[in-house]
């Protein structure tokens, strides 16, 4: 099993002082910064463009940036985020006319590529593109807004995705996003996830280190 990665979502950060807040959460022990990109077309919200990603790099953030594209179409914006400093770029299969091509484009731009599955979306989109996938991201809420509750059916889906990944033999991360918090992260990890997006569960607390330490303790109980 890969080392667990904690990826706070800046959707829940203090946007008025984003650089400071991101640095603080990294200092507290986060591994990756998760970047929710919404276009008010594919999902009913509008968030961040490549300029914000570039601004974090210019500020001095060196941690991996995990860009989750909730936009349609996707191909136009992929090179812009790669140039702005993204390390991972993931998208929803139904938002691309040519999934294989979009995955290859991400890799051609020097980033790790991934597919994102909404709660009711089947995993069958993976069948013919596993060789081009570095990350499988399962949404455990319906995308668009932070602060929602974890959808329990995601646990079974995580188990299915873990089986697919393990049997493929490829080096693929299994990420989960939505409603992840201290009191459910252990069962989420036990179902097979190794990368965890948490927004309000971390940024909504006054002491980031305390909550990340609590998360690490829960994760250690799974791998023990």
From Swiss-Prot:
InterPro entries noted in UniProt: Aldolase_TIM (IPR013785), Ribul_P_3_epim (IPR026019), Ribul_P_3_epim-like (IPR000056), RibuloseP-bd_barrel (IPR011060)
Cofactor binding note of this UniProt entry: Binds 1 divalent metal cation per subunit.
Source organism, top-level taxon: Bacteria
Catalytic reactions on record: D-ribulose 5-phosphate = D-xylulose 5-phosphate
Keywords, comma-separated and alphabetical: Carbohydrate metabolism, Isomerase, Metal-binding
UniProt-annotated catalytic positions: 36, 177
A biological process term (GO) from this entry: carbohydrate metabolic process
Cofactors demanded by this protein: a divalent metal cation
Pfam families xref list: Ribul_P_3_epim
PROSITE patterns: RIBUL_P_3_EPIMER_1, RIBUL_P_3_EPIMER_2
GO CC annotations on file: cytosol
EC number from the UniProt entry: 5.1.3.1
Pathways involved: Carbohydrate degradation
Sites where the protein binds substrate: 9, 68, 144-147, 177-179, 199-200
Binding sites annotated in the UniProt record for a divalent metal cation: 34, 36, 68, 177
Gene Ontology MF terms in the entry: D-ribulose-phosphate 3-epimerase activity; metal ion binding
HAMAP family in the cross-refs: RPE
NCBIfam families: PRK05581.1-4, rpe
Recorded family membership: Belongs to the ribulose-phosphate 3-epimerase family.
Role, per record: Catalyzes the reversible epimerization of D-ribulose 5-phosphate to D-xylulose 5-phosphate.
Name this polypeptide is given: Ribulose-phosphate 3-epimerase
Organism: Haemophilus influenzae (strain ATCC 51907 / DSM 11121 / KW20 / Rd)
């Amino acid at each position: 099993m890969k080392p667990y990665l904690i990826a706070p979502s800046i959707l829940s950060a203090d946007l008025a002082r984003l650089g400071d807040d991101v640095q603080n959460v990294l200092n507290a022990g986060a591994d990756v910064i998760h970047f929710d990109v919404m276009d008010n077309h594919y999902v009913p919200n509008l968030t961040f463009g490549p300029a914000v990603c570039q601004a974090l790099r210019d500020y001095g953030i060196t941690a991996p940036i995990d860009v989750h594209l909730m936009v349609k179409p996707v191909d136009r914006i992929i090179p812009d985020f790669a140039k702005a400093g993204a390390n991972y770029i993931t998208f929803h299969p139904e938002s691309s006319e040519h999934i294989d091509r979009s995955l290859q484009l991400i890799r051609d731009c020097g980033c790790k590529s991934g597919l994102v599955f909404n709660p009711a979306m089947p995993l069958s989109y993976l069948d013919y593109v596993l060789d081009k996938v570095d990350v499988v991201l399962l949404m455990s809420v319906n995308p668009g807004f932070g602060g929602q509750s974890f959808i329990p059916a995601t646990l079974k889906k995580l188990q299915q995705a873990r089986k697919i990944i393990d049997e493929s033999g490829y080096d693929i991360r299994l990420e989960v996003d939505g409603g992840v918090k201290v009191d459910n992260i252990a069962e989420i990890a036990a179902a097979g996830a190794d990368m965890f997006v948490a927004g309000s569960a971390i940024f909504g607390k006054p002491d980031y280190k305390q909550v990340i330490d609590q998360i690490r303790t829960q994760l250690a109980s799974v791998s023990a």
